């Protein structure tokens, strides 16, 4: 049986939200049938790199994604020239996904997925450029995915998209009385009220 290799395009595989979601899928897919490889935009190794390679994934490195950089675009196109084996590209670069998707389209990659993980972008100096790049995503992608309605509506406007719920290994969150007692002992909490926060503050 031929193994299908899917190219996941990310900034780097640190322990962020979308990276953790990807790893949750990656750990449980049938890797005899489907393999994930990763195109990252950092030269240094990241938190999940060892695990990816242990599961048979390849990691390719490009310079930082700068949409107006001739050096970046040259490196991106060279990558696709050298790797015609990829027939599915799954891009997680928010508004700048269009840069990769357009190159993939020009290299006749038949399945080009844009995946929205946010309902907004930082309003910094690059914000107008990101909004301009966002407009062409539906034209360059063959499939539009979002983690939720807000993320899909913001990224894709009126274009039709599919919501892909983030994968979570629920067994990691199963209540365990022994762990509760031990952790409270380690933290010196005894029976005090503890208020927890799950998520980020940004």
Give residue ranges: language-model regions.
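Membrane-interface segments of envelope glycosyltransferases acting on lipid-linked substrates or membrane lipids
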Residues: 1-202
């Amino acid at each position: 049986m031929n193994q299908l290799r899917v190219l996941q395009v990310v900034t780097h595989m640190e322990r962020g939200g979308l990276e953790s979601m990807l790893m949750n899928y990656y750990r449980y897919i049938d890797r005899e049938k489907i393999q994930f490889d990763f195109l990252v935009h950092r030269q240094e190794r990241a938190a999940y790199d060892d695990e990816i390679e242990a599961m048979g994934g390849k990691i390719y490195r490009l310079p930082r994604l700068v949409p107006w950089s001739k050096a970046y675009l040259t490196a991106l196109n060279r990558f696709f020239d050298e790797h015609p084996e990829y027939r599915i590209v799954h891009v997680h670069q928010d508004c700048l996904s269009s840069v990769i998707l357009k190159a993939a389209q020009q290299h006749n990659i038949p399945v080009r997925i844009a995946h929205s993980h946010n309902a907004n972008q930082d309003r910094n100096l690059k914000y107008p450029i990101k909004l301009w790049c966002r407009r062409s995503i539906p034209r360059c992608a063959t499939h539009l995915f979002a983690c939720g309605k807000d993320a899909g509506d913001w990224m894709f406007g009126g274009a039709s998209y599919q919501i892909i719920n983030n994968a979570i290994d629920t067994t990691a969150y199963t209540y365990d009385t022994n762990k509760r007692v031990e952790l409270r002992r380690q933290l010196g909490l005894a029976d005090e009220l503890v208020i927890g926060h799950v998520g980020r503050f940004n």
